[in-house]
């Protein structure tokens, strides 16, 4: 009873804090950041509180059940939210690159934890593991897979942001309009009047060109930073995913007598692994633009959710014990 009450308290604390943090981030888009810089820094500390809240929640279920809390969909979602909070904390201590990651990790953590705590998923009480999960490989395999999902989702979202910024039309339209006006003025006014008007226009035109170049330079810098962060995080997630698949193969051989059975979960995990292997291969080719790898990462984003929720929705295969019906 005490563990159940403590679990509910930690769940509500972490969810409430991360909700406040997300609200602060949205406010920073509406208000000048320099005016509320202290408010913004306090939101970063809020994610740290969320991290400890989720950590306490996981430890509470661990102590109460006697096994690592990754036996059902609810626990895996909480662990995924915990993974996003870890990524956020890493970016918090890396001051140069934290803002772009914060815009991804905070909303992701609140949506995942919100879904886990919603009415769609009942909060199951910790219970004895089913025979298929009673193995020392549970912590190794599932934790690596979830950490891999978290890092790959975060990196893929950064790539999607890169695509949005890249395809957004930003150009010196003011320059084109002024050139058209110049041709019309040449037809209507005398030389003295034109000289005065052209002087005024040249000043405005130069100011707009400087602004346009400055804006495009900032846009280019942002795209480069997103591409760099996406590559680093996806590389880390790919390592976790590889370790998770290999450890799962060893576990499958001990439990079912074969390393690979091609059930839905294994098949989609292999497809996801292949897509991100293609992403990393593209990144090693300097002749290929970053936009191509970002498109591959965006495809990988969809595949991760299919791999993560697909089997849970179907409730079939060797991994069906984590389905919605069983959680």
Swiss-Prot record:
**A GO term (biological process) for this protein?**
cytochrome complex assembly
Task: List residues traversing the bilayer.
Answer: 13-33, 46-66, 73-93, 101-121, 145-165, 233-253, 262-282, 294-314
Coiled coil start-end = none
Entries under InterPro entries matching the protein: Cyt_c_assembly, Cyt_c_biogenesis_CcsA, Cyt_c_biogenesis_CcsA/CcmC
**Per the record, what is one GO cellular component?**
plasma membrane
Q: Which Pfam families match?
A: Cytochrom_C_asm
Name the membrane topology term.
Multi-pass membrane protein
Q: What does this protein do?
A: Required during biogenesis of c-type cytochromes (cytochrome c6 and cytochrome f) at the step of heme attachment.
PANTHER family, A to Z: CYTOCHROME B_B6 PROTEIN-RELATED, HEME EXPORTER PROTEIN C
What's the protein called, per UniProt?
A: Cytochrome c biogenesis protein CcsA
State the species of origin: Lobularia maritima (Sweet alyssum)
